């Protein structure tokens, strides 16, 4: 038995662990393949390792977070505000020459003056919207009480005028009650001075238009009175 074991020195024994890498030549392709010992324990990675940790740049700051730029607020004196408000009242959109002239008077830069005018115009628009917002919810009937000649009260309405009564013409003629002969027109009643009697209509009413003239029933000549 010992002779057989000595005759096969390259055969590995059972139960031994090979820690080295073995290179063998593949018989078909002739390429070299690497054999790794499968008995070595695989490396285990902890879950969450390296996740969520901020990366720091060589300068000491965190990567991916830009530094917030601090804004420099300009404080205006009372004299400067008075000059700016006066210029805003004259012109809300000054050109470059007006801004440079105002910069020399106030001692500010032209860019600061331009930003101030932009903020001032935005403030004015906001004030105008706040003043018009309560009036937008009111209906047109609300303003009827504030019209001249209307009774007091924002929600009062004027009563409609009474219907107009039609009366005869103010200068109507009195026709005689005597029957007229055929084919003749009835003459109006004449007063002592020879003019027809006129009766005005009651005041406060509109007169009706006069009736159309009546056509003669016959064309016979008028008969004289006996």
Swiss-Prot record:
Key word Glycoprotein present: no
GO molecular function, a single term: DNA-binding transcription factor activity, RNA polymerase II-specific
Compositional bias (Basic residues): 64-73
InterPro entries, per the entry: HD, Homeobox_CS, Homeodomain-like_sf, HTH_motif, PROP1
UniProt GO cellular component terms: nucleus; transcription regulator complex
Gene Ontology BP annotations: pituitary gland development
Keywords: DNA-binding, Homeobox, Nucleus
Highest rank taxon of the organism: Eukaryota
DNA-binding region(s), residue ranges: 69-128
Compartmental location: Nucleus
Intrachain S-S bonds: none
A Pfam family hit: Homeodomain
Polar residues composition-biased segments: 30-41
Keyword Nucleus: yes
Span list, region Disordered: 1-73, 177-226
Bias (Low complexity) ranges: 216-226
Record family assignment: Belongs to the paired homeobox family.
Function of the protein: Possibly involved in the ontogenesis of pituitary gonadotropes, as well as somatotropes, lactotropes and caudomedial thyrotropes.
Protein name, entry field: Homeobox protein prophet of Pit-1
Organism from which the protein derives: Sapajus apella (Brown-capped capuchin)
